Amino acid sequence: MSHAVKIYDTCIGCTQCVRACPLDVLEMVPWDGCKAAQIASSPRTEDCVGCKRCETACPTDFLSIRVYLGDETSRSMGLAY
């Protein structure tokens, strides 16, 4: 079952989510939108098992990273009718 990982622009570039992921689904990429000049990216979502450790590790009040499991993926991305 595939999962979607969405990184929001409230990411502060702290790397907590990247370090929390046991399967290296996430990585940091350059971004000028925060002081850290980097943002989380999810280039390997096919490896995501939906453990949501990245969500738990996120220190922002906005939960800058979200994992949408299976059926949630279509609904959360606005693709379901």
Curated annotation (Swiss-Prot):
Its membrane topology: Peripheral membrane protein
Residues the record lists as binding [4Fe-4S] cluster 2: 21, 48, 51, 54
A UniProt-annotated Pfam family: Fer4_7
Entry annotated with the keyword Iron-sulfur: yes
Binding positions ([4Fe-4S] cluster 1): 11, 14, 17, 58
Signal peptide segment: none
Essential cofactor(s): [4Fe-4S] cluster
GO cellular component: photosystem I; plasma membrane-derived thylakoid membrane
Keywords: 4Fe-4S, Electron transport, Iron, Iron-sulfur, Membrane, Metal-binding, Oxidoreductase, Photosynthesis, Photosystem I, Repeat, Thylakoid, Transport
Cofactor note: Binds 2 [4Fe-4S] clusters. Cluster 2 is most probably the spectroscopically characterized electron acceptor FA and cluster 1 is most probably FB.
Assembly mode: The cyanobacterial PSI reaction center is composed of one copy each of PsaA,B,C,D,E,F,I,J,K,L,M and X, and forms trimeric complexes.
Annotated PANTHER family: PHOTOSYSTEM I IRON-SULFUR CENTER, PHOTOSYSTEM I IRON-SULFUR CENTER-RELATED
Name under which the protein is recorded: Photosystem I iron-sulfur center
Provenance organism: Prochlorococcus marinus (strain MIT 9312)
